């Protein structure tokens, strides 16, 4: 579930994208509320109407003005139950990652799919790359996490957290030399970061043996 910002423009944009939107209305008064859930399934700007699936009514048509008043009395709460491959058109990247992270706690496979589709939409967002790499790593899909961090660093070569996580992923696939090179790249970017210094010492405790097929790591200039 993804909560929308409460505006008619956002609401109509989602509906125009064939995404039904669950809304809360107050059909009563502020001092005597009558809470009601409905699903917005259509609108007509020429006729100034909104079509709701409300209770047992599949197509309840009301004026936009009336709908907006009852919606406003419920603080314009709205949400969509989006599938991983159908990101809300009005979604904010960082907020979307936070929502998917909550899903990840119970449904890690669905979260991975959601992160992958989010990267297709926001390839320049480092947080999404980190989230995908971390999700794969936590599921012990170490080679997948290596590939994810490597690809992410093409877009964000100066992101020390990506380098740090890339180093740990490389270490998990027995690429010790590449792992140490990657953590040195992270430290070069932020030499006084105590967490990176800890990672540097930690990774140097492992055997530096190298598997047959390992990444060749080059720090950004």
What does each model-found stretch correspond to?
Residues 118, 151-152, 185-186:
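Canonical positions in the second alpha-helix
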Residues 4-53:
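Active-site-adjacent substructure of cysteine-protease-like catalytic cores
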Residues 93, 126-127, 160-161, 194-195:
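Helix-start (N-cap) detector for alpha-helical repeat units in TPR-like alpha-solenoids
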């Amino acid at each position: 579930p993804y909560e929308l910002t409460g505006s008619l423009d956002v609401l109509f944009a989602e509906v125009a994208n064939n995404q039904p939107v669950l809304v809360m209305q107050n059909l009563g008064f502020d001092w005597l509320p009558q809470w009601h859930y409905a699903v917005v399934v259509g609108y007509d700007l020429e006729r100034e109407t909104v079509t709701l699936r409300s209770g047992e009514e599949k197509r309840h048509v009301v004026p936009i003005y009336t709908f907006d008043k009852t919606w406003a009395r419920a603080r314009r709460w709205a949400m969509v139950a989006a599938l991983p491959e159908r990101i809300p058109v009005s979604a904010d990247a960082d907020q979307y990652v936070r929502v998917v992270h909550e899903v990840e706690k119970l449904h890690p496979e669905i979260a991975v799919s959601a992160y992958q589709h989010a990267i297709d939409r926001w390839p320049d967002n480092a947080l999404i790359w980190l989230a995908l790499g971390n999700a794969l790593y936590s599921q012990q899909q170490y080679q997948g996490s290596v590939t994810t961090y490597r690809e992410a660093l093409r877009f964000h070569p100066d992101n020390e957290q990506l380098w740090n996580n890339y180093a740990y992923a490389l270490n998990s696939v027995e690429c010790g030399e590449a792992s140490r090179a990657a953590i040195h790249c992270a430290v070069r970017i932020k030499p006084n970061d105590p967490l990176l210094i800890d990672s540097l010492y930690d990774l140097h405790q492992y055997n530096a043996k190298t598997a047959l097929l390992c990444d060749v790591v080059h720090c950004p200039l």
